[in-house]
């Protein structure tokens, strides 16, 4: 079984989920890449959402987990990004499971 340090629990139609996915998947280069679980398209979506609520105290989506710890939802991911704290948060919580995290625009500037 493949271990993924960053998992985004989402619903395909949710604007907050779209924003979090856009930041994590398009704005950042994260290795290994985050795994997205679309709860509205998953056969066990309702059960997973209930389990997330029980384990993280958060029933709403998106719910972004790093090594099993919730860092919050769309507003939280946006705030971490705007404060330039998202990469360090992912690295700190991801530990040995996160090989690389950087903003794609910063990577281009460095080249």
Where are each of the predicted segments found?
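Thiol-based oxidoreductase modules, predominantly thioredoxin-like and allied folds used
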Residues: 31-47
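Amphipathic alpha-helical protein-protein interaction segments
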Residues: 10-13, 38-42, 79
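Local sequence-structure signature of Cys/Sec-based thiol-disulfide redox active-site neighborhoods
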Residues: 1-35
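Non-catalytic, surface beta->alpha helical segment in thiol-disulfide oxidoreductase systems
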Residues: 66-107, 111
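Short coil/turn segments at secondary-structure boundaries
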Residues: 20-22, 48, 67, 76-77
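Short amphipathic alpha-helices and their capping/turn residues within compact interaction modules
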Residues: 6, 19, 25, 29, ...
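Beta-strand cores of modular interaction/reader domains in eukaryotic scaffold and signaling proteins
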Residues: 7-10, 35-38, 63-65, 70-71
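Thiol/disulfide oxidoreductase modules built on the thioredoxin-like
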Residues: 52-60
């Amino acid at each position: 079984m493949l271990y993924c340090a960053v998992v985004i629990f989402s619903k395909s139609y949710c604007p907050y989920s779209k924003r979090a996915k856009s930041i994590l998947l398009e704005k950042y280069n994260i290795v290994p890449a985050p795994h997205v679980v679309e709860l509205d398209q998953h056969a066990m979506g309702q059960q997973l959402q209930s389990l997330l609520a029980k384990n993280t105290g958060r029933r709403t989506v998106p719910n972004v987990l790093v090594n099993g710890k919730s860092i919050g939802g769309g507003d939280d991911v946006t705030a971490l990004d705007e404060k330039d704290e998202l990469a360090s948060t992912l690295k700190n919580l991801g530990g040995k499971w996160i090989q690389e995290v950087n903003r794609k625009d910063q990577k281009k500037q460095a080249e």
